[in-house]
């Protein structure tokens, strides 16, 4: 790792520690992700190789953080080599951007054109992942990095991504920050699809408009109460099979509310798109690809993307 000079630790990702670093030969600032995936006697474990090849494939999109290289390092501590992933570096994320508009010296709404542009780029990135058979499963504002000068948004931290080309694989539950978690995951469904990411996209969209989480639960139960209070408690007619999901019968039966007051500055097209991302039945939820053609984006200059 002599090639890089670590400047500061900038976080803990799904992979492990993340550092801001300088590539000495070029002067380029990069993000170094030290993976927890230690190599075994055979070399790099197949899971790590799969993850890396997936990241390389996905980072061909402008809207996914680019993986620049992979470095093998001999670790003196236990003699096991480590794997560092070298990514392009972006200095802020959507959470910090929203927070800067909510608090601080100059609280103000995000400009509608900015929301439109960020959402379009997010849908482009998600559509790219889905087209390559990958669910992100942990989309949240902290995982959406921004190049503020260029107005570009990029999806990061695909550490929980799994190829979903194996149909209806039983996935593990422990994923996704609660506020962006899809109802089928919260209700314990172990079979899910690309629709889980679109539910997160809807929550992120609403948060850009509101500057605070749409469903700010601190437990799975609380999270579902927030969702059901606004969208109504789903029925088997709306969402076939929902009543057979875990803990279903403990929830009060609420009627759906008008969502408009929750996102007061959003026009009819925006509200329609939001509603389509938050549909209960995953099969009815709008796809990322279809979202790109939604009338909400008609006033956006798409030639720039």
UniProtKB/Swiss-Prot annotation:
SUPFAM superfamilies the record matches: Protein kinase-like (PK-like)
Entry's Gene Ontology molecular function annotations: ATP binding; cyclin binding; cyclin-dependent protein serine/threonine kinase activity; protein serine kinase activity; RNA polymerase II CTD heptapeptide repeat kinase activity
Residues bearing PTM Phosphothreonine: 14, 172
InterPro entries the record matches: CDK, Kinase-like_dom_sf, Prot_kinase_dom, Protein_kinase_ATP_BS, Ser/Thr_kinase_AS
GO cellular component, one term: cytoplasm
Modified residues (Phosphotyrosine): 15
Domain of life: Eukaryota
UniProt keywords, alphabetically: ATP-binding, Cell cycle, Cell division, Kinase, Mitosis, Nucleotide-binding, Phosphoprotein, Serine/threonine-protein kinase, Transferase
PANTHER family hit by this protein: CELL DIVISION PROTEIN KINASE (PTHR24056), CYCLIN-DEPENDENT KINASE 2 (PTHR24056:SF254)
Job description of the protein: Plays a key role in the control of the eukaryotic cell cycle.
Protein name: Cell division control protein 2 homolog C
Native source organism of the sequence: Antirrhinum majus
Gene behind the chain: CDC2C
